[in-house]
Amino acid sequence: MRCSVTKFFCSTAKKSQMVERVKDYMYKNDKLFELLDARILEMKEGYAKVEMVVKKEHLNAANVCHGGIIFSLADLAFALASNSHGKLALAIEVSITYMKAAYEGEKLVAEAKEVNLGNKTATYLMEVKNSANKLIALAKGTVYRVNEDFPPTS
């Protein structure tokens, strides 16, 4: 009994360390964080939450947040969640539906949740909400899980 409890805690600690390594690596190396001025709010295996504030440079010709910016925020959460297992995950399909416009000055939060984890593929649902907790966009993405450690060790 004692051995299995120790194994559980060791395994949980290793998973937590892996998530932190992925989080740190992605934040430092994915230039989209800097471009969007986005930050990671929360991350664990199969889950991530990121936020940004809509700025003037994020607006389209209709003076609302460009759909590509909203998609990019959802994609950041998707990338974090899908790579959180320490195995390189590359998007093979992503779709998004926009529900509501976002405006300059609004805080947007994207949350990615794992709905299926297989050996080769995994699927995630992403929601983007504003500070009033209104749904701005809903996305679904699938990744191919490459047989490579992530982040790279070298």
Swiss-Prot record:
One MF term in the entry's GO annotations:
acyl-CoA hydrolase activity
Entry-linked InterPro entries: Acyl-CoA_thioesterase_PaaI, HotDog_dom_sf, PaaD, PAAI_dom, Thioestr_dom
EC identifiers of the protein: 3.1.2.-
Looking up Pfam families in the UniProt record yields: 4HBT
Q: Which key words tag this protein in UniProt?
A: Hydrolase
Q: Which domain of life is it from?
A: Archaea
Which cysteines are disulphide-bonded?
A: none
On whether Amino-acid biosynthesis is a keyword of this UniProt record, the answer is: no
Q: Which family does it belong to?
A: Belongs to the thioesterase PaaI family.
Q: What is this protein called?
A: Putative esterase AF_2264
Organism of provenance: Archaeoglobus fulgidus (strain ATCC 49558 / DSM 4304 / JCM 9628 / NBRC 100126 / VC-16)
The taxonomy runs: Archaea, Methanobacteriati, Methanobacteriota, Archaeoglobi, Archaeoglobales
